[in-house]
Amino acid sequence: MFKEKYEGEQKLVDKVVNQSWVYLKRAHFHSQTMGVISIAFSILVSWLGLPGMLQFTVSTLSGFGSLGYGFFWLLSGFMAPGLGSTGAAKHSVELVAQVSAVSFFVAVVVTFVLVIHKMFIQRGSRKETA
C-alpha cells in the first residue's frame, strides 16, 4: 500500500498522517462544542415549556448533529492514511457530515424560532388580551 498510494515517498505519508492528526483533533473540538450547544438547546426548549414532542425533536436533531459531525471528522482522520489522502477520506464519508450538519442546523433554526416566538409574539399577544 505504501508504494501504491504514496509512490514510496515518506514525505507524502507524513503529510497525510499529520493532516489526519489535525482531523482527529477537529473531531474532538466539534463534538465537544456542538455537544455542549446541544445540551444547552435541550435545556432551553425544556425551560420554555414546549410540548414534549417538540422538545424531543430539537434534542434529537441537535444531539444527532453534534455526534455525527464529530464522527465525520473522526472517520476522515482514521481513513485518510489508508486511502492516500485526506480529500479522499472526506469525500468517502461526506454524507455523514451533510446529514448531521443539516440536522444540527434545523435544530438551531427551530430553537431560535421558538425562543423568538415565546419572547416576542406570545408575550405580545398576552399583553393585548390583558
Regions found by a protein language model. Name each.
Residues M1-K15:
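Histidine-/acidic- and/or cysteine-rich, low-complexity loops and terminal segments associated
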Residues L12-I37:
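Individual transmembrane alpha-helix segments
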Residues K15-V22, G49-T57, S85-L95:
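Juxtamembrane loop-transmembrane helix junctions in multi-pass integral membrane proteins
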Residues K25, T60-G63, Q98-A101:
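Hydrophobic alpha-helical segments of membrane proteins, primarily the transmembrane helices
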Residues H30-I43, F105-V109:
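Hydrophobic alpha-helical transmembrane segments
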Residues I37-G49, F72-L83:
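Membrane-helix exit/interface motif
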Residues S42-S62, R123-A130:
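Cytoplasmic juxtamembrane regions at transmembrane-helix boundaries
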Residues L67-T129:
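Alpha-helical transmembrane segments of multi-pass integral membrane proteins
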